[in-house]
Each structure stands twice: as structure tokens, then as C-alpha cells.
Curated annotation (Swiss-Prot):
<protein>
    <recommendedName>
        <fullName>ESAT-6-like protein EsxE</fullName>
    </recommendedName>
</protein>
<keyword id="KW-0964">Secreted</keyword>
<dbReference type="Pfam" id="PF06013">
    <property type="entry name" value="WXG100"/>
</dbReference>
<dbReference type="InterPro" id="IPR010310">
    <property type="entry name" value="T7SS_ESAT-6-like"/>
</dbReference>
<dbReference type="GO" id="GO:0005576">
    <property type="term" value="C:extracellular region"/>
</dbReference>
<dbReference type="InterPro" id="IPR036689">
    <property type="entry name" value="ESAT-6-like_sf"/>
</dbReference>
<comment type="similarity">
    <text>Belongs to the WXG100 family. ESAT-6 subfamily.</text>
</comment>
Length: 90
């Protein structure tokens, strides 16, 4: 296990999460403006699809947060174990 590679993966996951949050904010703004003037069955179907997409996106963000936390914990565990092992042999 290379702690540097693990730390890099955790950083990339966090960056992806921030990027997704920016995209979601932009999408929500566009959808809100769209539905000011759009009505009818198509608008209702779109609103339902948007709610479904938003629920899936929220699940993805939650899973990403859990994965990031697990990666951070694993990094701390590995680097701690490495430091202990090095200390025993120094």
C-alpha cells in the first residue's frame, strides 16, 4: 500500500465531490428558471425526472463522502502503522 497514492485518490474524490456540487447548483438554477414558464404534461414529467435524478445524485454524494472518509481513515491507519514499524526497527 502506497499512502501517497491513497492520499491522492482521496484528494481526487473530494475534488470530484466539489465539482458535482457546482454542477448540481447550476442545474438546479436552470431547472428552476425553466419551470417558471414551462407548464403542462411535459413540464410535470421533467420535474419528476429531475426529482428522481436529484435523489440519485444525493445518494452518490453520500456514498462519495463515505468513500472519502474510509480513504482518509485508511491513510491514517497505514501511515500510523508504517511510523510504528519504522520506530521499532530504528
Amino acid at each position: 500500500m502506497d499512502p501517497t497514492v491513497l492520499a491522492d485518490a482521496v484528494a481526487r474524490m473530494a475534488e470530484f465531490g466539489r465539482h458535482v456540487e457546482e454542477l448540481v447548483a447550476e442545474i438546479e438554477s436552470l431547472v428552476t428558471r425553466l419551470h417558471v414558464t414551462w407548464t403542462g404534461e411535459g413540464a410535470a414529467a421533467h420535474a419528476e425526472a429531475q426529482r428522481h435524478w436529484a435523489a440519485g445524485e444525493a445518494m452518490m454524494r453520500q456514498a462519495l463522502a463515505q468513500l472519502t472518509a474510509a480513504g482518509q481513515s485508511a491513510h491514517a491507519n497505514y501511515t500510523g502503522a508504517m511510523a510504528t514499524n519504522l520506530g521499532m526497527w530504528s
